Amino acid sequence: MSRYTGPSWKKSRRLGLSLTGTGKELARRNYVPGQHGPNNRSKLSEYGLQLAEKQKLRFSYGLGEKQFRNLFVQATKIKGGILGYNFMLLLERRLDNVVYRLGLATTRRQARQFVNHGHILVDGKRVDIPSYRVEVGQVISVREKSAKVPAILEAVESVVGRPAFVSFDADKLEGSLTRLPERDEINPEINEALVVEFYNKML
């Protein structure tokens, strides 16, 4: 299954989760799109609940099914800790997500584009792989030639607040993951236990 690139507002309403991170999609119409609108919420089976939660998490990070599943498999091989939390940490440590958390992009989709286009450096070296796994303390910065890109500057200026687990220098356009986030600091609306149950049945 390929990565979803369609209208994020419609998908957000279907999933009941803001994929842009702004919440604007749900502010006016917090029900699924379509003719029947708010009356179209049906009771889901156990499998349906697990699938829906998996889709919410997958779409929120903008990953294709194969990439998402492979990351889950990697999480199962981590010794110690809770599987669901370990999986969430792998998602959070993706370079495109860290760029988004630092406020260098307004959405994860935009952050992925910035990485793909070579605008982002890791410890001074250009990295154009969105799935690159960021280590605590690594410096994420904007390439000098990209420092005047309007979309990047607009993103930085529009930031209201950043997570406590990152640091950022707006003058240098650089920041880092200062520590691994606690579970309650990332996607509190997601029940990752349902995602674990889904894949435990599938793998």
UniProtKB/Swiss-Prot annotation:
Keywords recorded for this protein, A-Z: Ribonucleoprotein, Ribosomal protein, RNA-binding, rRNA-binding
Gene Ontology terms: cellular component: small ribosomal subunit
Is the keyword Ribonucleoprotein assigned to this protein?
A: yes
Q: Which SUPFAM superfamilies match?
A: Alpha-L RNA-binding motif
> InterPro entries in the record, alphabetically?
Ribosomal_uS4, Ribosomal_uS4_bac-type, Ribosomal_uS4_CS, Ribosomal_uS4_N, S4_RNA-bd, S4_RNA-bd_sf
Q: Which domain of life is it from?
A: Bacteria
- Domain named S4 RNA-binding: which ranges? 93-156
Where would you find the membrane-spanning parts of this chain?
Answer: none
- Using the record for this protein, list the coiled-coil segments as residue ranges, or answer none: none
Please give one Gene Ontology molecular function term for this protein: structural constituent of ribosome
Q: List the disulfide bonds.
A: none
**Biological processes, Gene Ontology terms:** ribosomal small subunit biogenesis; translation
Q: Is Protein transport set as a keyword in this record?
A: no
Record family assignment: Belongs to the universal ribosomal protein uS4 family.
Q: Which NCBIfam families match?
A: PRK05327.1, rpsD_bact
How the protein assembles, per its UniProt entry?
Part of the 30S ribosomal subunit. Contacts protein S5. The interaction surface between S4 and S5 is involved in control of translational fidelity.
Job of this protein: One of the primary rRNA binding proteins, it binds directly to 16S rRNA where it nucleates assembly of the body of the 30S subunit.
PANTHER family for this protein: 30S 40S RIBOSOMAL PROTEIN, SMALL RIBOSOMAL SUBUNIT PROTEIN US4M
Name of the protein this chain belongs to: Small ribosomal subunit protein uS4
Q: Lineage of this protein's species?
A: Bacteria, Bacillati, Bacillota, Bacilli, Lactobacillales
